Amino acid sequence: MPLRGLAKAKNFTLGPTAPMKTFTENVHSQNNEINNLKKIDKTHNLTNNSQNEKLYKYESQIKSSFDRIVPTLKEIARIQHHEDFINTAQSISKQNLGINLPTHILDKSWVKPLDMRALYAWCAFKQHEKLSDNFFENDPLEGSFGSPNANNFETALLDCGIHLLDITPCSDGRLAHSVAYVMRIPFSAVRRRSHAGALFDIENTVNRWVKTEHKRYRENNPNEAHEDTRYLKIVTYHFSSVDPLHQGCAAHGSDDKLAAKEGSEKLLAFKEAVENSFCCGASVDLMLIGLDTDTDSLKIHLSSSDGKIDLENTISSLDIYNSTINFSKDEAEKEICQIISGNSNKVQLKGLDKFVYKLIVNNISQIDYVKKFHKGSYEDIGHAERFIGVGIGFKEVHLRNLTYFAHLDTVEEGAPDLDVGVKIFTGLNVSQDLPIPIVIRFDYSGKVPGAKERAAKDCYRVNNAISIRYKSLVDKGLLHTCLTIRDRDNIHSAQIIGMSLDQKTKEAH
């Protein structure tokens, strides 16, 4: 893929930057922890090694399918004037990528140079289609609705006093795997919507809370309304321990203190909105988590005595990993319990303490995942996404640096998120004369009459707005779009309803 190597460069940045806070000692401490991690040639006794092997196999399979696009197109470009070019090109594409190329583009190779930009975008879109088909048909992450993993996790959530888990990670592609990999949560058991800087829309989140509580009253789903459980809202911001000055959150100028502060403010505003708008003690639980995008370790912020989020006091999963690496399983579990609650018996853990315990144990497996398969710290410390996902949906995307998310209903309201994504891909792709692939998605409920048609209209509306906002890129063939819809009430993959690459029909005269 283009410019993937630049993601390794420590001075490479595409987002806006700002003066960093003075935390030199913390940076040195974090780097020392990473160096120590790399030296330890053993896995933690709490690590799920078999799960790690499955997850790595899936990650390798999907990413390699995208990374083979450029070498394949280079091979095809060299033979575009050969005899029987179209059949040979299709054979190469089928063998290397498992897809067919658009004949209406290949057909023109005898009169003008092959449109490699169009072919690149086509391949990216078709690989996403294959990813979606595989995800919903085969459940490679074993986290679909009704699966044993999902059922067990939902039961565990209720046992923690949580009836719904709602997570907002930053839209940065380095957090796209935060649910299924970093936290090891079955994707169907969590509500996930990414936003730049993890700065979610408060009104929309209140509306989702209302729908959740309504289902409890009307359907006893996931539990009865009188039961003492809460809606848990989590914000996941991110930082870089390897290059904190440049590879942190672009929306916050790589200032992780600012990212944590604004994430906390959003959470508290959401809680206040619920409490001010509804009676009878209505409230929610909150959690702020920092994710180190280099090691996938977590910093979980604790609640202060007045119920607010403590920005300074955190539990570090990497610290726990390093301090318990030589412990037996039982000893490590007791130590984690002691750190969380002050007692060493996990049976005595209650509520959010029990949930935090589960997160830390799960994340220890991910720390070992990065340690084993990525030498303790990811080589691509910066952006290396393969396409931009725009709209509402993308349940199937759970891999690091695969997709930059811009969740939106309209381009106007989602412009800040989308502009950041286009800026990132200007460095990754446009600088290499390759286009920005944008997959537009609107999920719909098949139970609602006319919902499918409205979702399709939303796709075309957003597509038109994108073509206007980024007209100069579109006119040069440096931005292409793929329009998709999906019925979220069924286990079906996304359906492509149109592309900017579709063959244009001649007008009748």
From Swiss-Prot:
Its EC number is 4.2.1.1. It is found in: Carboxysome. One of its GO terms (cellular component) is carboxysome. GO terms for biological process: carbon fixation; photosynthesis. The keyword Ubl conjugation does not apply. One of its GO terms (molecular function) is metal ion binding. Keywords: Bacterial microcompartment, Carbon dioxide fixation, Carboxysome, Lyase, Metal-binding, Photosynthesis, Zinc. It catalyses: hydrogencarbonate + H(+) = CO2 + H2O. Binds 1 Zn(2+) per monomer. Zn(2+) binds at C170, H238, C249. Its cofactor is Zn(2+). Its main location: other. InterPro entries: Carboxysome_shell_carb_anhy (IPR014074), CsoSCA_C (IPR048620), CsoSCA_C_sf (IPR043066), CsoSCA_cat (IPR048539), CsoSCA_N (IPR048619), CsoSCA_N_sf (IPR043065). The active site is at D172 (proton acceptor). Homodimer. Belongs to the beta-class carbonic anhydrase family. CsoSCA subfamily. Reversible hydration of carbon dioxide. Essential for photosynthetic carbon dioxide fixation, supplies CO(2) to RuBisCO (ribulose bisphosphate carboxylase, cbbL-cbbS) in the carboxysome. There are estimated to be 29 CsoSCA oligomers per carboxysome. This is Carboxysome shell carbonic anhydrase. The lineage of its organism: Bacteria, Bacillati, Cyanobacteriota, Cyanophyceae, Synechococcales. The gene is csoS3.
